[in-house]
Design a protein with these regions (language model features):
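Short C-terminal tail/terminal secondary-structure segment
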Residues: 212, 223-238
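Conserved NAD(P)H cofactor-binding loop of Rossmann-fold oxidoreductase domains
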Residues: 76-82, 232
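Catalytic loop of short-chain dehydrogenase/reductase
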Residues: 124-146, 151-160, 172
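Conserved glycine-rich cofactor-binding loop
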Residues: 12-13
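A conserved structural motif in NAD(P)-dependent oxidoreductases
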Residues: 196-207
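Substrate-binding pocket helix/loop in short-chain dehydrogenase/reductase
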Residues: 84-85, 92-97, 188, 192
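Short, small/polar-rich loop/turn modules that mediate ligand/substrate recognition or access, typified
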Residues: 159, 164, 222-224
Length: 238
């Protein structure tokens, strides 16, 4: 895994940041994409990109493909978008699929030709406990479920080329975004913790550990799988 070149989307916050740090610590060359890059001490090569803009995304991926021999792609972008069923509108539904699925498709399409040629590669998609169902998250659950379907489909398609494709599905994670919605000690936090058998939030670095494992040599024969990092929150009967 050392000296591998890994592209990470959503690389400057939360899980994407933790993944980038872990990869750099293991000697990987990290290429990060994020909307805001000013004043960030990133452990690799960082590029500004509005991933909501398909044209801008495609052009930057072309530039990166010509500059770096990307061995692996980690799709981290895709913020949670809670809304009750009665409040779902087409704009939010399309936005969820755009950020969670279209961006991943573009990123993978850009670098799969090189992986096929080298007969080696890794793709990890960040999905979430939401793929097992979560009230009030229609658009987000649908988009992440679609990404999980892509994961399994790509795994079958790329296995003959030695490329593995897997998903990591975290439950609630201790991030600034989470705390903005669920302050420590709030009723909102208590409601979330009640859904986690282990009684605490995941740390971003714990999720990153699962991602980095799937990128490593020890996971060379694992493909098409979903690893939950959710403290038991996706288990039936919880």
């Amino acid at each position: 895994m050392k000296n591998s070149c890994v592209l990470v989307t959503g690389a400057t916050k939360g899980i994407g940041w933790a993944v980038s740090q872990r990869l750099a610590d293991q000697g990987c060359h990290v290429v990060g994409l994020a909307r805001h890059v000013a004043d960030i001490d990133f452990p690799g090569y960082l590029y500004a990109c509005d991933l909501a803009n398909a044209g801008e995304t495609e052009e930057l991926l072309r530039v990166i493909r010509e500059k770096y021999p990307v061995d692996a792609v980690v799709n981290c972008v895709g913020p949670a978008m809670p809304e009750p069923l009665g409040e779902v509108d087409l704009a939010s539904l399309y936005q969820a699929f755009d950020l969670n699925v279209r961006v991943a498709v573009q990123a993978v399409q850009a670098f799969v030709p090189g992986m096929r040629a080298r007969k080696s590669g890794r793709i990890v998609n960040l999905c979430g406990r939401v793929v097992h169902g979560q009230a009030g998250h229609t658009s987000y659950a649908a988009a992440k479920s679609a990404l999980l379907g892509c994961t399994r489909t790509w795994a079958l398609e790329l296995a003959p080329y030695g490329v593995t494709v897997n998903a990591v599905s975290p439950g609630p994670v201790e991030t600034g975004l989470f705390r903005a919605e669920c302050p420590v000690g709030s009723d909102a936090e208590k409601t979330v913790l009640a859904t986690i058998p282990m009684g605490r939030l995941a740390q971003a670095d714990e999720v990153a550990a699962a991602v980095v494992f799937l990128l490593g040599d020890g996971a060379a024969f694992i493909t098409g799988q979903e690893i939950g990092v959710d403290g038991g929150g996706s288990l039936a009967g919880r």
